[in-house]
Amino acid sequence: MLLTLLSKMKQHNIGIVELIDRTLNKGVILNADLVITVADVPLLAANLKLALASVETMLKYGVMGDWLVPVSLNKEENKAIETVEIKN
Amino acid sequence: MPDDALYVYGIVKLGFDLDWREAGIEGKNVYTISECGFSALVHDCEEKPYMSEDPNKIKELIIAHNKILDRAINHFDGVIPLHFNTIIKKGGNSSQYNLKKWLNNNKERLEKTWDKIKGRGEYGIRIYYDKEKLIEEVSNSEEIKDIETNREGKGAGLSYLLQSKAKTKINEIGWDKVNGFKKKFYDDIKKVTANLKITPSRIFIDEEKDLLVNLSVLADNQQINKIKGFLEQKIGNGFSFQLAGPFAPYSFVENETA
């Protein structure tokens, strides 16, 4: 039972981390003078990536901290990041 | 401070303005601004990026950003996702004018990108292999067995050298096989969808398994089912996989519509 739960949480976390990775690192970048990017975004990115790094560390050591638990409780958000796992 | 800037989530092919009434980041009302057949999904905001030192707040921002993109995929049959925290300033005109100007200037590239992503979602595929099983197979190969046979009856020094040679050979053959597996998976999946990228993996979750390759694919429902079917056939032969998605097609729009 516990193993099943942990397995489900891991599946969910993979979806979350994949989503965060894409959101922070990818997507169209507008190269226009009137877009807020130059001064502010590097700082923001550093801040967010620090948060992401802490998630990776938590996952690495199997710690399901506060950062992730609220996400797994929200059905709407779960739907948005549905993850499928197929194994042996 | 007035909300005279625009936070832009993504671009859809709609062509007319719509008060979409979806709640975006911090509950802001999301609507569209259209030009040249394309519509940007936006909310009014201040001229400053969304940031916080609270991880929970950051999580909320990211989820809210993606919720709008997910809704857009369902409503408009696709979305061109913009980088998180894309905010258009007012400058000497209005932020709306600046956005329309950008849409107009990038129409051709938006058309090209839309044709590629319409009706498709992005999926992350992690394929793992059983390292121990592979080493065992290689260790039992004729080439390694010959080296081991040669060791028999040899003096300590020569035996040690041959043992080292066997280890090096196991490593070489192992890596060749891993690279071969990787190429085969890539080629086979590419037969289903040409929109395929190897993604550097920064995240290792199942430490008991070894990651063979981390892929991002752009696929419609039929294609992803075909890929899943193909991967399922490989299960039990020393491979396993995890598939996450669908996501907005983040990996397939970069540097194309900027």
Language model: regions and residue ranges:
Chain B
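An interfacial alpha-helical scaffold signature
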Residues: 1-258
